[in-house]
């Protein structure tokens, strides 16, 4: 029996939950949000969609976090959304306080679940939740960037996207790095002779989220589908290779930075050792930068809490 809980059902939470439920494999789905009536009305929408597809999924909607219990997978999308012109790191203090509260409450009735962090800045929120909950947390990491990479190369070369492989790693967002030693086209290593440059690809992967947010107010459909695929891989033990952020010790903190990793009911191993030297160096540089910013943000968080 697969029991999945969604904590927060704003735009991205709704999209992920909808895609997950329409897959039809979940036995029970719990929907929580702090906004009155939102979970209940969203449940009605889901029931109508399930009726159309003739699918049977038990649904529970609630504004009471205590009702969320016994989940195998907990997907956290709660928090303030990223607005136009705002970096993911700008969100840190406000959303970290939410994660601290959830970390104190959720494990009491969901101990041993796999926690999947979606709230931005996602890798830092995963690290905060793990720090205060001591539970196993993964971040959706750079799997979204990975799909953007593949989609762009396929479009530029006018080939089916399944002929493009490769991964993005490091911290999710503006500082993500393309792991070029993993990128192949038609099974062969990527070459600029194909008609698209590395710089062009990297520029697209970094800038397209901001452009979508500027026009559409947020990135929803791509991430919503991609993250639902991650949930499915965990729930059904699919053992897919995905670029997610898993916990790792870095100096005195547990941090989350993405590397290609086998994802199933258990997470790992990572494929970091298969990367070339340049990609490994770029990953280490990303980890160091993440750690330094994370530690600085933790200081701001502590100062903000003390000032309350």
Curated annotation (Swiss-Prot):
Lineage: superkingdom: Archaea
Keyword Nucleotide-binding in annotation: no
UniProt keyword list: NAD, Oxidoreductase, Tricarboxylic acid cycle
UniProt-annotated binding residues for substrate: 82, 88, 120, 148
GO terms of molecular function: L-lactate dehydrogenase activity; L-malate dehydrogenase (NAD+) activity
Enzyme class per UniProt: oxidoreductase
InterPro entries tied to this protein: L-lactate/malate_DH, Lactate/malate_DH_C, Lactate/malate_DH_N, Lactate_DH/Glyco_Ohase_4_C, NAD(P)-bd_dom_sf
Residues bound to NAD(+): 8-13, 33, 95, 118-120
GO biological process terms held by the UniProt record: lactate metabolic process; tricarboxylic acid cycle
Reactions that this protein is recorded to catalyse: (S)-malate + NAD(+) = oxaloacetate + NADH + H(+)
EC nos: 1.1.1.37
Family (UniProt): Belongs to the LDH/MDH superfamily.
Task performed by this protein: Catalyzes the reversible oxidation of malate to oxaloacetate.
Protein name: Malate dehydrogenase
Lineage of source species: Archaea, Thermoproteota, Thermoprotei, Sulfolobales, Sulfolobaceae
Annotated gene: mdh
